[in-house]
Swiss-Prot record:
UniProt family annotation: Belongs to the MnmG family.
GO BP annotation list: tRNA methylation; tRNA wobble uridine modification
Subunit composition and interactions: Homodimer. Heterotetramer of two MnmE and two MnmG subunits.
Binding positions (NAD(+)): 276-290
Required cofactor names: FAD
Gene: mnmG
GO cellular component terms attached to this protein's record: cytosol
Protein's name according to its UniProt entry: tRNA uridine 5-carboxymethylaminomethyl modification enzyme MnmG
Highest taxon listed in the record's lineage: Bacteria
Matching HAMAP family: MnmG_GidA
tRNA processing keyword on record: yes
Biological function: NAD-binding protein involved in the addition of a carboxymethylaminomethyl (cmnm) group at the wobble position (U34) of certain tRNAs, forming tRNA-cmnm(5)s(2)U34.
Biological source species: Neisseria gonorrhoeae (strain ATCC 700825 / FA 1090)
């Protein structure tokens, strides 16, 4: 093979053009770093490899956090979303989430446009087969045709491509996804570097030709009106034409067909060694695990406005193709369905995320960052969020500046990273709101309030977004202050007016702020009082923020007290090379776990399985004694 060194040296190289890679490259370039994005195929940049949707419970929170940090996913979704819904709209603010069906072609085009118009970013089409090192530090990568690209930091976002193997029934072949080759050489090279790794599995359902679906037998599921918006930089005018999803169900016949294929299932015959996602199981896994259920709901999701292709959400499978045809046609409305693409499972290498720092830099190779499914996560949103963080921290590393580290009480991205690096995983990791201890702090509506300032400080957030954020923050502060200084007395309001708005008579003088805290009174009703309306025209986002801050103030204050009480533990750093054998009272088991995981802070140590509260207390005593001795 010929070998040449590319004449330009980069600050950051990103390997992979999926959701993690595109966010990583855009983040690094936005911060002013000379960045190269390497992908095996420029035509597949930003491709939605599985389901045509963005967001949902927990995932939508990550998308908003990405957006608050200047990321691309939310804005691309506004430009490509063909159905938007607000989930849990009637529930508490902490679990409300936005979900969108996206037109695959429009989404990919939007991401491609952002990449091609981003300053400081070069694209190059070549598969990466090797990484180069100078001692224990990354120095670049080598592509399939022997071109060596030099860089001071590298972000690997290889998705399911590392030694990927595709399964349909008992047949299997190497591949990164259907139609794309696996990254076999790179996977082998990373194993040579003794990075701890394992095998995981994911899957996708067969795709159906919409012209062969009988929609008259299905239940229609339209989007919300008014149509929600994902990005603070987006608006409803960006949205393309809106369309419906459709609902059908499996039945006992479907389940019998699926069971008849178990003897040819790669999952049940041992052909697949990797562990699949618990919360997005294949249909055969569902039928096996929930044998008492006679039916499962299946959502038929349109793949776009210019295609007849539908994605049947809920029947991911690696069963033989004859079984796939039969199970699809056993469902109402799909009796004559034509399958355009078969479903399949894919096994791939991942690397133990406990070998990562909170910055997503590997502990063993300086300047090498991992993001996305290579870390064992599943989902576009989880990958994109990690990509942005890894890209930003690659730049911070190159500049010799402190990394962007997000705390558990600050962001779902902070929860995600902390879970990965302290607990590891034995199945693909998916984000849920239940994973966060401080859900009330981590709402979709306040993602910008939590993160935009940090993003702006390091160059992730541009001036236009920063200006919009400050206008919103100041409007919220002004309105809350106005509510506190606008008073009503029982004598000021007619008795029937009091009963109409409050449901009862006022017993004493009260300001609008205190009245809004009442559980049966919302902002809109309160503003019907004479003289209550603000003089400025407030956006729906400002009003929502005001209402939530006022109504949940007591709960938020209590959570803040809890967070403050743990701050010492969370932020106290553990010295590099600390000898846990010198910590008096630590058991051999705890010493072993701490030496294995190498946590960076006491907070991280406290979340390692087997590290008890008593062990954490001993660590704190040891560190404080060390600080005193140093003085």
């Amino acid at each position: 093979m010929t070998h040449m060194i590319y004449p330009k040296t980069y600050d950051v190289i990103v390997v992979g053009g999926g959701h993690a890679g595109t966010e990583a490259a855009l983040a690094a370039a936005r911060m002013g770093a000379q960045t190269l994005l390497l992908t095996h195929n420029i035509e597949t940049l930003g491709q939605m490899s599985c389901n045509p949707s963005i967001g949902g419970i927990g995932k939508g929170h990550l998308v908003r956090e990405l957006d608050a940090l200047g990321g691309a996913m939310a804005l691309a979704t506004d430009k490509s979303g063909i159905q938007f819904r607000r989930l849990n709209a009637s529930k508490g603010a902490a679990v409300r989430a936005t979900r969108a069906q996206a037109d695959r072609i429009l989404y990919k085009a939007s991401i491609r446009e952002m990449l091609e118009n981003q300053e400081n970013l070069d694209l190059f089409q070549q598969a990466v087969e090797d990484v180069t090192l100078e001692g224990e530090r990354i120095s670049g990568v080598i592509t399939a045709m022997g071109v060596e690209f030099k860089a001071r930091a590298v972000v690997l976002t290889a998705g399911t491509f590392l030694s990927g193997k595709i399964h349909i029934g008992l047949e299997n072949y190497e591949g990164g996804r259907a139609g794309d080759p696996a990254a076999k050489s790179l996977g082998g090279r990373l194993r040579e570097l003794k990075l701890p790794q394992g095998r995981l599995k994911t899957g996708t359902p067969p795709r159906i030709d919409g012209r062969t679906i009988d929609f008259s037998q299905l239940t229609e599921q339209p989007g919300d009106t008014p149509v929600p918006v994902m990005s603070v930089r987006g608006n409803a005018e960006m949205h393309p034409r809106q369309v419906s999803c459709w609902i059908t169900h499996t039945n006992t016949q479907t389940h019998d067909i699926i069971r008849s294929g178990f003897d040819r299932s790669p999952m049940f015959t041992g052909k697949i060694e990797g562990v699949g996602p618990r919360y997005c199981p294949s249909i055969e896994d569902k039928i096996n695990r929930f044998a008492d259920k006679d039916s499962h709901q299946i959502f038929l999701e349109p793949e776009g406005l210019t295609t007849h292709e539908y994605y049947p959400n809920g029947i991911s499978t690696s069963l033989p193709f004859d079984i796939q045809i039969a199970l699809v046609r056993s469902m109402k409305g799909l009796e004559n369905a034509h399958i355009l693409r078969p479903g399949y499972a894919i096994e791939y290498d991942y690397f133990d995320p406990r070998n990562l720092k909170a910055s997503l830099e590997t502990k063993t190779i300086e300047g090498l960052f991992f993001a996305g499914q290579i870390n064992g996560t599943t989902g576009y949103e989880e990958a994109a969020a990690q990509g942005l963080l890894a890209g930003a921290n690659a730049v911070q590393y190159v500049r010799g500046q402190d990394p962007l580290l997000l705390r558990r009480e600050q962001a779902y991205l902070g929860v995600l990273v902390d879970d990965l690096i302290t607990k590891g995983l034995n199945e693909p990791y998916r984000m849920f709101t239940s994973r966060a201890e401080y859900r009330l702090q981590l709402r979709e509506d306040n993602a910008d309030m939590r993160l935009t300032e940090d993003g702006y400080k390091i160059g992730l957030v541009g001036e236009a977004q920063w200006r919009m954020f400050n206008e919103k923050r100041e409007a919220v502060e002004r309105e809350i202050q106005r509510l506190k200084t606008t008073w009503y007395t029982p004598q000021k309001l007619a008795e029937d007016e009091q009963i109409r708005v409050f449901g009862q008579k006022l017993s004493r003088e009260a300001n609008l702020h205190d009245l809004l805290r009442r559980p049966n009174l919302d902002y809109a009703a309160l503003m019907t009082l004479e003289g209550a309306m603000p003089s400025e025209n407030l956006s729906a986002e400002v009003i929502e923020q005001v209402e939530i801050q006022v109504k949940y103030q007591g709960y938020i204050d209590r959570q803040n007290e809890e967070i403050d009480s743990r701050r010492d533990i969370e932020t106290l750093k553990l010295p590099d090379g600390i000898d846990y054998g010198r910590v008096k009272g630590l058991s051999a088991e705890v010493q072993q776990k701490l030496n294995q995981h190498k946590p960076e802070t006491v907070g991280q140590a406290s979340r390692i399985s087997g590290v008890t509260p008593a062990a954490v207390a001993l660590l704190m005593v040891h560190l404080k004694r060390g600080f005193k001795d140093a003085k």
